[in-house]
Swiss-Prot record:
Molecular function as annotated in GO: ATP binding; D-ribulokinase activity; ribulokinase activity
Pathway membership: Carbohydrate degradation; L-arabinose degradation via L-ribulose; D-xylulose 5-phosphate from L-arabinose (bacterial route): step 2/3
Gene3D superfamilies (alphabetical): 1.20.58.2240, 3.30.420.40
Keyword Nucleotide-binding on entry: yes
EC number of the protein: 2.7.1.16
Keywords on record: Arabinose catabolism, ATP-binding, Carbohydrate metabolism, Kinase, Nucleotide-binding, Transferase
Record family assignment: Belongs to the ribulokinase family.
Keyword ATP-binding carried by entry: yes
Protein's recorded name: Ribulokinase
Catalysed reaction, written as an equation: D-ribulose + ATP = D-ribulose 5-phosphate + ADP + H(+); L-ribulose + ATP = L-ribulose 5-phosphate + ADP + H(+)
Lineage: Bacteria, Pseudomonadati, Pseudomonadota, Gammaproteobacteria, Enterobacterales
Domain of life per record: Bacteria
Annotated organism of origin: Yersinia pestis
GO cellular component: cytoplasm
Length: 563
């Protein structure tokens, strides 16, 4: 053990657009400093085709942004503070895997694959593997094998590990022949910084393996060779089998930072790397979540985390969610994951739609660009204010929040967004109100998915930029869910959670609950449901559910007729 007094832990949060580094005092939880750097290639739209649901991240985006963020922040610390940095924790989006070669190098870092999107990290929201996910689901339900989707909600998603591997393996012969394994981003960064990227040395995180890779101790780890071979023999002939057997909870040390990376980042060579996990799971820890608290990590999408005890769950498999994994959030507790595939992304889509004339005007009148950009940047805030001033629910359009498919309940990435009940009196603020209600309805559907299976929800926490900056949207969520909604007092809970795990791995605290008591953030405010609005939203929610049942069959896969 080392003393927590004066010790500093760093949390690295790899998001969809940027990486954030946060320095935290291990004794008092003070957030000392932070830095955010955007991914340069991603910002230019490289390697992505939104119309085909292809979203890829070049590994150099992660490396360059991480190096810049840490160096810039560390420069602002005193020499004494720099020497007291004891650990680094890492969280990331997920499932965001990439292919690696025999040396553990991500293929896109090699000259022969430098511009090949299939050799890069396949971002969580990449849905190019819908058909492959359906293959996995059919095989799980075929009766030929045990149902290996049992503990991930019964539906394997196109956003997850094996579906993405299967899609890329079939689409790209060169990648298939060069790759010996695949690695999640949250596992790769600690391995990179500690020099343990060789496939046999990688410490696979319990969180990513259990929620996305069909890993479970009841069948000895990953599904058997025969199951993967039945999907495609390349999964066992071209890739290492088993890809891994053991998994580790995130408070376990991965290793010590290498001398090269210590110098590049301006850090002591004694820094310890803790295990990686997904952003929302670490965000729940940073928010101080306790058992049976539903933690909503709200951003472009949402990830919802619930911690339950093994005795309550027993051997039950909770249907319709994104997995139940012992140790994926807190060691010794079952972490359950759910989420909405689009939340902030829906608002951004609506903003972009309305901004089209502004973009055209900027092209023809370049001198107007500063004013037009200002109008566009204020658009969502203006819409929110306009609707809040006249929040009529009498003619509110019903919107289905499937603009990026549906993650929970019951993952189905074929689904598309639906807007109904428009009339000639529907204006932009009213339609935006329908979007706000839709995201709240999606949140309630997740809550009910747990409760209907005897998993109680005693408390609801919301964290992230939208949660803190948009009380109007959060109040609608409280009214729709008919629950007090606690807003967490930090925009950086995911990075804070990563720092908490780093503090434990480095020995500044004995265990995660102790570290939480010292370092987790506080509640900023609590929103109470409005009884009148609760009743009115209940009626709209029933209509939302009716439209869900009506619309979903229209997105079933079309049977191909062979002539």
């Amino acid at each position: 053990m080392i003393s927590a007094d004066g010790a500093i832990a760093l949390g690295l949060d790899f998001g969809s657009d940027s990486v954030r580094v946060l320095a935290v005092d291990c004794q008092h939880g003070t957030e000392i400093d932070t830095e955010v750097v955007y991914y340069p290639r991603w910002k230019k739209g490289l390697y992505c085709q939104a119309a085909q649901n292809q979203f890829r991240h070049h590994p150099l985006d992660y490396i360059e942004a991480m190096e810049q963020a840490i160096r810039q922040m560390v420069k602002r610390l005193s020499e004494e503070q720099r020497q007291h940095i004891v650990g680094i924790g890492v969280d990331s989006t997920g499932s965001t895997p990439a292919p690696i070669d025999e040396q553990g190098q991500v293929l896109a870092l090699r000259p022969d694959f430098a511009d090949n999107p299939n050799a890069m990290f396949v971002l969580w929201k990449d849905h190019t593997a819908i058909e492959e996910a359906e293959e996995i689901n059919r095989l799980c339900r075929s009766g030929e094998f045990a149902d290996y989707s049992r503990y991930i909600g019964g539906v394997y998603s196109s956003e997850w590990f094996w579906a993405k591997i299967l899609h890329v393996t079939r689409a790209d012969v060169a990648v298939r022949e060069a790759a010996v394994s695949w690695i999640e981003l949250c596992d790769w960064v600690p391995a990179l910084l500690s020099g343990t990227t060789a496939p046999q040395d990688i410490q696979r995180g319990r969180c990513s393996a259990g929620h996305k890779s069909l890993w479970h101790p009841s069948w000895g780890g990953l599904p058997p060779r025969a199951f993967l071979a039945a999907l495609d023999t390349s999964l066992v002939n071209d890739l290492d089998y088993p890809m891994f057997t053991d998994t580790y909870t995130a408070e376990r040390p991965v290793g010590q930072i290498t001398a090269e990376w210590a110098e590049r980042l301006g850090l002591p060579t004694t820094v310890i790397l803790s295990g990686g996990a997904f952003d929302c799971h670490m965000g729940a820890v940073g928010a101080g979540a306790q058992p049976y608290t539903l933690v909503k990590v709200i951003g472009t999408s949402t990830c919802d985390i619930l911690i339950a005890d093994d005795q309550r769950v027993g051997d039950r498999a909770i249907a319709g969610i994104c997995g139940q994994v012992e140790g994926s959030v807190l060691p010794g507790w079952i972490g359950m994951e759910a989420g909405q595939s689009a939340f902030g992304d829906m608002y951004a889509w609506f903003s972009n739609l309305l901004s089209w004339p502004l973009h055209q005007a900027a092209l023809t009148q370049p001198e107007w660009q500063p004013q037009l950009k200002q109008i566009e940047s204020n658009l969502l805030a203006s819409l929110t204010r306009a609707w809040a001033q006249n929040p009529s629910l009498d003619h509110l359009p019903v919107v289905l929040d499937w603009f990026n498919g549906r993650r929970t309940p019951n993952a189905n990435q074929r689904l598309k967004g639906v807007i109904t009940d428009l009339n000639l009196g529907t204006d932009a603020p009213t339609l935006f109100g329908g979007f706000i209600a839709a995201t709240a309805f999606g949140a309630r559907a997740i809550m009910e998915c747990f409760e209907q299976q005897d998993i109680p929800i005693d408390n609801v926490l919301a964290l992230g930029g939208i949660a803190r900056k948009s009380p109007v949207i959060m109040q609608v969520c409280a009214d729709v869910m008919n629950r007090p909604l606690q807003i967490v007092a930090s925009d950086q809970c995911c990075a804070l959670g990563a720092a908490i795990f780093a503090a434990v791995a480095a020995g500044a605290h004995d265990d995660v609950p102790t570290a939480q008591r010292h370092m987790a953030c506080n509640i900023e405010r609590t929103l109470i449901p409005d009884p009148v609005q609760v009743v009115r939203y209940q009626q709209l929610y029933q209509r939302y559910q009716q439209w869900c049942h009506t619309a979903e069959p229209h997105y079933a896969p079309v049977t191909k007729v062979i002539h």
